[in-house]
Amino acid sequence: MAAPVNKAPRDADLWSLHEKMLAQPLKDNDVEVYNIIKKESNRQRVGLELIASENFASRAVLEALGSCLNNKYSEGYPGQRYYGGTEFIDELEVLCQKRALQVYGLDPECWGVNVQPYSGSPANFAVYTALVEPHGRIMGLDLPDGGHLTHGFMTDKKKISATSIFFESMPYKVNPDTGYINYDQLEENARLFHPRLIIAGTSCYSRNLDYARLRKIADDNGAYLMADMAHISGLVAAGVVPSPFEHCHVVSTTTHKTLRGCRAGMIFYRKGVRSVDPKTGKETRYNLESLINSAVFPGLQGGPHNHAIAGVAVALKQAMTPEFRAYQRQVVANCRALAEALMGLGYRVVTGGSDNHLILVDLRSKGTDGGRAEKVLEACSIACNKNTCPGDKSALRPSGLRLGTPALTSRGLLEEDFRKVAHFIHRGIELTLQIQDAVGVKATLKEFMEKLAGAEEHQRAVTALRAEVESFATLFPLPGLPGF
């Protein structure tokens, strides 16, 4: 008689190990991943995070994100799922939708919201899919002028974003001298291009948008107006910048930037009566709800990330508190203090200041560029990102640095602290110029980095500045989960 392939004792041992695997904490189960997370946690703790699109989520948000909701699959919408066992998932999604409308003061009879997008880029593409036919026309702020990749970016030689591949895209621009959006040129180009959708949104623009002007341009051309408020959604919630909801048909956003939630997306859309015929009294109603919901699911996504929806719901509750509004006011105050300090040190800030959470520093007058400065600052534990400035000839060597205040404001930095941060940045850029002088202005970024790493005097300067930066940064607690 043949013996069983697996003996019972061995099966029991394996099952015991399986149970142990499920119950082990990360540090015991996967030390490699655990150590990477610990290193990243330490980098965030000892460094100065100035990337404008980043923030530090609260402990409550991260707890929701790491909950059992990760286990549940739930294709469809509340009350209309393709899976059983979704009673509490429905309850959660409806709560998140309710809070999303409340935080922006929206009447549920006039506005709806889809909270299932995985992030901002899928949210935007869902709107385009819903409202613009294939190869239909879209206008968004050009990426080198402060727009976002998903707003239709392309170069003279190549269509880069999927938006520009599947739709016809014409960018609008800023005035290269002032850095402000050229609304007159936008109006003229829209008249010639006849877009189906105009996008009012930015990723590196420090001034408030003129939503009323944009809506008039959209109406004159029979276009929808969509706001992408991903960067400023927390500021809008707190009432410290103008709201797009008064003028726009659709509003999309991420949830992890100034809103300080986890990584996800939302799409708000108008509903109810769109217009009334003055002669007949006949009402025309918006049909955006069905179009957008169908585009998100089943058009572009499968099951929603329920753990992320929970994290968003928690962040939205926090966003309705007085302390959150105070935080957002401080974000703007800190940004203005940073801008003023850098201008006082001789730097040119595009548009001469900021209305929101970010600034763009133009380094052309200093004789260097954003790529080199970013690398030196990173070596000194200051995280920011290179960015094109208005008038840049090539995106391969952008002239600017984008700096944002949301993350460090979450750690408790105030105006005087940001003035100190400005001096750290200044010293990093001065070091950038020294290395550039040594290697030559025409050297490649690779050659520049080799000089930075190989020259003892430069390494001494980096080490000294990094020590000061890290000593300063560790004075401020890092939000999040204990132990991480």
UniProtKB/Swiss-Prot annotation:
Pfam families referenced in this protein's UniProt entry, alphabetically: SHMT
InterPro entries reported for this sequence: PyrdxlP-dep_Trfase, PyrdxlP-dep_Trfase_major, PyrdxlP-dep_Trfase_small, Ser_HO-MeTrfase, Ser_HO-MeTrfase-like, Ser_HO-MeTrfase_PLP_BS, SHMT-like_dom
Keyword Flavoprotein included in the entry's annotation: no
Domain of life the protein comes from: Eukaryota
Modified residues (N-acetylalanine): A2
Cofactors: pyridoxal 5'-phosphate
Main location: cytoplasm
EC number(s) from the headed UniProt entry: 2.1.2.1
GO MF, one annotated term: mRNA 5'-UTR binding
One cellular component term from this protein's GO annotations in UniProt: mitochondrion
Residue positions where N6-(pyridoxal phosphate)lysine is found in the record: K257
CDD domains hit by this protein: SHMT
PROSITE patterns: SHMT
GO term, biological process aspect, one: purine nucleobase biosynthetic process
Subunit composition and interactions: Homotetramer. Identified in complex with ABRAXAS2 and the other subunits of the BRISC complex, at least composed of ABRAXAS2, BRCC3/BRCC36, BABAM2 and BABAM1/NBA1.
More about this protein: In eukaryotes there are two forms of the enzymes: a cytosolic one and a mitochondrial one.
Family designation: Belongs to the SHMT family.
Role of this protein: Interconversion of serine and glycine.
Annotated protein name in UniProt: Serine hydroxymethyltransferase, cytosolic
Annotated organism of origin: Ovis aries
Gene label: SHMT1
